[in-house]
């Protein structure tokens, strides 16, 4: 069997001012290789694609490489970049004439001129290969699934985990289901439903968070005869597009009405449990009062509003600014992306004093540029993994590294700040440990991303965690992200009905 394998993966925050260009993909994972050996070696132990390749190898299937492009979440993808990658995919498919196409897609990509990026990509491929060549794709748990995507894919499998530790497993299942279909000859039918909701990502953890009962219910349905797959999606709230929000896909070998009934049931479940996705946000003045009232404790202040894995620019200063203003000391900050300050630090060298404006340079949504006088305490240039979380569930996560570029640790009177040249996620690692810094010396940590992810990596000390009421394009209060112009209406909580 000849299998075309590729991917296009980006979670697009349409409220983020930073456009996603080709360099954004190359900084994460990008390959356009005709050579199978080069392609398979590139994805030898990566988070994505590896699951497809290993299972195809088990069946001795031939791999036909397609472009594979993965970028860290940010703003709109430049049209020329997407069109070039799509056209290259179509050229490769037309030339190689595969028996099946396997793709790793996010499901929440937005391109200039293409709101439904994955729908456009899948429909373009289906128009080329026809009904006789199936298209199987894996989607992120936070995909904004559209009817066009469902119509043009023969099978869509969503991740069942947050954090996303089952990517390889789901890719492998795609290949296994295809071979089962070849062997048994069953015909699959897929149904879809979408409730009128827009949910924040902050509490979508599948290990006790709001998505836990949905995944459990999906697994129960999958025990029924004829049910191939049930995928509930939390959706991504930072994309202003028509189908932003949660959805459900169900694929069966029985009547499609069976699949639709399952989708409708879980859709109603989303409506009934919608409030479980919204978390309490702690006002910063109360956080400061709490810290001052019990200074011997350790605190972690989570900034989800500037989450780099949700498209935030990661140069937000709002929380740090308020803590400094409130007289808080011994602060450790992970991270602020600022190329100017990084360059200044590297030119000055370790031990030097630098003065400048830190952060707040992407837009006016994440705080002001802070005037600083700081000592350059560390300069680092080395690869750092994306994940180091412990536990059996992370055993097959993959050795994915992120391009931090140059890293400078600068120290002011009140804070040590990790400043990066590139925007990077740190929620699944203890960045301080990788920089040979003992995070226990800080009274307060300021961390960007999901609190539940950080807890796994700062478990050596008991912290009091606060999810701060902050500002930014990932605000868990979805009514405060920005003006939604394209999403279907009415939708909760934007219309509060």
Task: Explain the meaning of each model-derived region.
Residues 271, 388-497:
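Extended hydrophobic packing segments that form well-structured cores
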Residues 1-58:
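N-terminal amphipathic/basic leader segments beginning at the initiator methionine
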Residues 2, 58-61, 65, 91-101, ...:
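Glycine-rich phosphate/diphosphate-binding loops that line cofactor/substrate pockets in enzymes
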Residues 53-81, 85-92:
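Low-complexity, highly charged intrinsically disordered N-terminal segments
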Residues 171, 175, 179-219:
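Conserved anion/nucleotide-ligand pocket segment
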Residues 57-61, 94, 127-130, 158-161, ...:
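Generic secondary-structure signature for well-ordered alpha-helical cores
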Residues 4, 8-11, 15-16, 25, ...:
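Active-site histidine-anchored catalytic micro-motif
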């Amino acid at each position: 069997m000849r299998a075309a394998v590729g991917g296009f993966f980006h979670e697009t925050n349409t409220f983020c001012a930073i456009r996603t260009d080709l360099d954004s993909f190359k900084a994460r994972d990008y390959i356009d290789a005709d050579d199978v050996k080069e392609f398979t070696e590139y994805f030898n132990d990566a988070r994505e694609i590896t699951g497809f390749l290993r299972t195809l190898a088990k069946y001795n299937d031939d791999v036909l490489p397609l472009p594979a492009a993965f970028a860290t979440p940010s703003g709109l993808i430049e049209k020329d970049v997407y069109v070039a990658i799509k056209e290259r995919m179509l050229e490769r498919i037309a030339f190689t004439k595969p028996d099946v196409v396997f793709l790793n897609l996010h499901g929440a990509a937005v391109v200039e001129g293409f709101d439904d990026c994955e729908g456009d990509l899948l429909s373009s491929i289906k128009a080329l290969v026809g009904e006789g060549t199936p298209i199987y794709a894996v989607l992120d748990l936070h995909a904004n699934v559209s009817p066009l995507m469902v119509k043009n894919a023969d099978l869509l499998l969503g991740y069942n985990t947050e954090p996303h530790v089952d990517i390889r497993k789901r890719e492998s299942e795609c290949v296994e289901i295809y071979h089962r279909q070849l062997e048994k000859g069953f015909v699959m039918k897929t149904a879809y439903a979408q409730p009128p909701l827009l949910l924040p990502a902050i509490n979508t953890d599948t290990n006790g968070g709001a998505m836990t009962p949905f995944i459990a219910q999906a697994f129960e349905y999958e025990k029924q005869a004829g049910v191939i797959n049930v995928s509930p999606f939390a959706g991504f709230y930072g994309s202003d597009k028509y189908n932003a929000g949660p959805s459900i896909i169900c694929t069966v070998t029985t009547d499609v009405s069976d699949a639709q009934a399952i989708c409708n049931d879980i859709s109603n479940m989303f409506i009934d449990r919608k409030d479980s996705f919204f978390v309490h946000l702690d006002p910063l003045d109360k956080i400061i009062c709490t810290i001052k009232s019990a200074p011997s404790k350790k605190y972690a202040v989570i900034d989800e509003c500037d989450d780099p894995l949700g498209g935030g620019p990661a140069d937000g200063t709002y929380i740090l600014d308020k803590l400094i203003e409130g007289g808080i000391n011994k602060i450790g900050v992970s991270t602020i992306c600022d190329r100017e300050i990084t360059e200044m630090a590297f030119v000055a060298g370790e031990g030097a004093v630098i003065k400048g404006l830190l952060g707040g340079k992407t837009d006016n949504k994440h705080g002001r540029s802070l005037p600083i006088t700081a000592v350059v305490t560390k300069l680092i240039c080395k690869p750092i993994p994306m994940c180091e979380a412990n536990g059996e569930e992370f055993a097959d996560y993959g050795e994915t590294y992120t391009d931090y570029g140059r890293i400078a640790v600068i120290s002011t009177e009140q804070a040590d700040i990790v400043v990066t040249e590139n925007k990077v996620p740190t929620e699944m690692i203890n960045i301080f440990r990788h920089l040979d810094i003992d995070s226990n010396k800080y009274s307060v940590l300021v961390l960007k991303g999901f609190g539940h992810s950080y807890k796994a990596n700062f478990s050596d000390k008991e912290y009091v965690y606060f999810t701060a009421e902050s500002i930014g394009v990932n605000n868990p209060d979805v009514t405060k992200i920005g003006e939604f112009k394209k999403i279907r209406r009415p939708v909760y909580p934007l219309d509060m009905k």
